[in-house]
Amino acid sequence: RFLQYVAFDTQSDPNSDTYPSTAKQLILLNHLLEEMLRMGLEEVEIDAHGYVTGTIPASTGCEKVPTIGFISHVDTSPDMSGTHIHPRIIESYNGEDIRLNDDLVMKVSDFPELEHFKGHRLIVTDGTTLLGADDKAGIAEIMTAAAYLMDHPEIEHGKIRIGFTPDEEIGRGVEFFDVEKFGADFAYTMDGGFEGELEYENFNAASAKISVQGRNIHPGYAKDKMINAIEVLHDLHALLPATQRPEHTEGYEGFYH
């Protein structure tokens, strides 16, 4: 499933005024809709904003168990290409540096977390695009679990709600998400770090777009007249606390970036 999902180009676009920000996200969202219908899930739908939801009904006798939700986003970061992805499978990782292509190497010294995956099967890119594991790995996990539960009705569980959203990477993922309609008592986003981790709090951020209009004057006549927009922005950036940057903060410490 994962390799199938990453073949879809689902980059979001922070400069778009539409929702979803790119129409190509809807291609994967509709694919997931059809897949859930084939599995036999109930209440499967896509709304006007592209949110896809579905239900695995509760087992007999478990109707009063709290409803659990699982959510993932379909979009990938606009910072790097998501087109023509070429995944490569490393069957048994040897714990050494991974050469993605002739020019790019994932060094264990730069990514020490690789040491935890020696002997595991890894999926990497050819270094020219994103892989899209954020968050198509989460989608694959949810859909695989859903298929398993639908195929094994002997496993007792309460009502399970599934949701797939667009535009998370550009900070708009839940802009129109109807929490009440989703109807979960508890919900988990399958978009995280190491196996076994459970994050019970979330990161919040706000962004600002600042434009400076300079004044261009011939350098020979510029005294007290020229305004260099780059210098103004540089001065503004210098006013931000130097110790409150991502490279100097951790935990609950906020930062400017």
State what each model feature region is.
Residues 28, 134-141, 229-232:
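Catalytic-loop motifs flanking and including active-site residues across diverse enzymes
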